[in-house]
Amino acid sequence: MHIAVVGLSHRTAPVEVREKLSIPEQTMEESLQNLRGHDQVLEASILSTCNRLEIYTLVRNPELGISAVREFLSSHSGLETGDLKPHLFAYHHEDAVGHLLRVAAGLDSLVLGEGQILSQVKKMMRLGQEHKSLGPILNRLLTQAVSTGKRVRSETNLGTGAVSISSAAVELAQLKLGQSRGLDELVTLEDEQVAVVGAGRMSRLLLQHLQAKGASGVVVLNRTVARAEALAADFPTLPVQCRPLKDLDHCLSTCSLIFTSTAADDPIIDAERLSKLNRRSSLRLIDIGVPRNIAADVEGIGGVDAHDVDDLKEVVERNQEARQQVAREAQGLLDGEARQFLEWWDSLEAVPTINRLRSSMESIRSEELMKALSRMGPDFSARERKVVEALSKGIINKILHTPVTALRSPQPRSDRQNALSVVERLFDLQADEDSVQN
């Protein structure tokens, strides 16, 4: 068996490719079932965010398993495998383990050290558990990835002052507004008429950072006004107007800065929609949705300045240099966590032999106990029988403790295989098909 990951990210694919592979939560169960339906895939878990799609699997054969995942991605996205392959990365075994730990720690994020990715890894694990696509291997790996992500943030300064996608979007707005005034600096948003489309987690973060950057008020549009009102209630000192999404055209006509972050499958703003509006001032659109909420053709509309998540790199690069040294320090911690998981993985090789050894000892114990009890006669009480049985089990456990601990302990694979061979010969342990790992 092998752990493998196949995916793409902001490092390997532009947003127009990433949005085609995005897997929303409502279709996650179906996608996981499709993956698990392949005879090569034993366990599966999917991480889908605005900047990456990664599929982690436990497979029988790494080459065949990775090929199966690529075929799934091609079918899901509608892209030919040949067109998709240049954007994909694939790792297996220790490289796959190391990659997941880097992702959970925020070292592979567009915004180095950002905290939201850890929540997304937790969600990946929760969905895998709910849809029963995880087994003991990936469940152990994801659990360790989450604990590693927490440890990196608590034991290093990586998370200190880290920006998020939402805060980078607000900074991009400040930067572009400053550049429009001939300034290479971030300027306040107090004079901007700001709107946020969507009322989810990303929109919550947008409101938080808009308030911090001086926005005097925000319009929140959402299909469900009640959800927008619930969001606004968390910002009592920020004037927030809540409107239904049908008022979007009004906001497009009156606002100067609009952020979009919805789960819509198709763009909600395009050139045709904008061309019908009677605007008298410029409009800046910043889209952090994947799939994109704003169509690429809006760039052809005069007075409209549109940006998507890939444009956030301009802001991120201004903040990254000072964090690189901290990231290098965090990598040492990740290396230790990866070794720990791989040592556990290697120890699984001993499990079938240990199980057969325990089974053999239990058969001997049970047989000899029955012989002894039969000689005790009817005067031997039930309580005394329980004491003798507990004694026999205790003796077996004491005898097995040292060899079992030795077989499970970290060691070169050749040493463990030699030890397993010796134990199997000494105790005449015959392997059966059910106990042999694929």
UniProtKB/Swiss-Prot annotation:
GO terms for molecular function: glutamyl-tRNA reductase activity; NADP binding. It catalyses: (S)-4-amino-5-oxopentanoate + tRNA(Glu) + NADP(+) = L-glutamyl-tRNA(Glu) + NADPH + H(+). Its EC number is 1.2.1.70. Substrate binds at residues 49-52, 109, 114-116, 120. PROSITE patterns: GLUTR. The record marks 99 as: Important for activity. Keywords: Chlorophyll biosynthesis, NADP, Oxidoreductase, Porphyrin biosynthesis. The active site is at 50 (nucleophile). It comes from the Bacteria. The keyword Aminoacyl-tRNA synthetase does not apply. The keyword Repeat does not apply. Transmembrane segments: none annotated. PANTHER family: GLUTAMYL-TRNA REDUCTASE 1, CHLOROPLASTIC. Catalyzes the NADPH-dependent reduction of glutamyl-tRNA(Glu) to glutamate 1-semialdehyde (GSA). Belongs to the glutamyl-tRNA reductase family. HAMAP family: Glu_tRNA_reductase. This is Glutamyl-tRNA reductase. It comes from Synechococcus sp. (strain WH7803). The gene is hemA.
